[in-house]
Amino acid sequence: MYNLTRLSNKKLTIRINIVTVTFIIVIIMVIYSLLLKQCRLSSDSSNNSQLKKQKYRLLILILTAPDNMKERVTLRKTWLSDKSDNVKHLFVIGTENLQLENHETLQSEQLKFKDLLLLPKLRDAYGTLTKKVLQSFKRIIDEYDFDYLLKVDDDSFVLIHKLLVNLDTWEAKGYRKELYWGFFNGKAQVKRHGAWKESEWNLCDYYLPYAVGGGYVLSYNLVKYIAMNADNLRLFNSEDVSVGLWLSAVANIERRHDIRFDTEYRSRGCSNDYLITHKQSPDSMKALHDYYTATGNLCSKEFSNRMSYHYNWTVPPSQCCVRKPGII
């Protein structure tokens, strides 16, 4: 009888131990599960923080060619050196079919300056400029947050701080429209010959009103609209003409023609009122920057090469743009 009682107590002890061990294992598993979940949440939070887009007041896209190292160096040393932290610039370059040596040079430049937007699926050429702009818009919408975009060429000189002041003034007036700002042309005849010929243009005898390509500003939502509809847009040889066409049917836009944008295919001269002046060589870029830094004026002597115009939005585009003396 004693042995049976002893055996029964022993079995009970074993059962209690099994229950205790099982309970401990369950507790450990619950704690481990909670810790794992916390780690995942922490990791997700860290990843989300890393993926958060940097916000800029102004994002500057500068179209440049792979071999235009001198132009990029000049811009970094001149007007880009004056930009504030809320301004981001990117040199846009297509890298498809580049020779290995060119790739290595660009990679070295990227490591040093971290300001290249490289497009691996774009062959960099005059005939692909519109694709270049379109692919750039898609990339920056994915990777950056910004209020306004300035698109310029690598031979354009820009007074960034004056652009920013003008943007602040425009917003302070309470406008609720999207901004398309530049030097507009509404009566440019369709090119049928040469590098910029448009064999596919069949909309009308003239290009639709557009801001010429030496420099123009778009508000964020317009860039996003183009990027989101990229697969459905018609592409023409001239990127500035294409942008004007893409935005032609969009409502709630202020098309702001500004004679302070010297952004046509050749410069109109030099004026201390200019915000952007196009077709500048590296040497003239340095001279403009040095003189502006020393005096606060862009020109040592103001002059005009050709007449300008105020855009008349009340008449048909073919009558919009009458050049007159006395306009910068």
How should these model regions be labeled?
Residues 2-328:
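Secretory-pathway lumenal glyco-enzymes, predominantly type II signal-anchor Golgi glycosyltransferases
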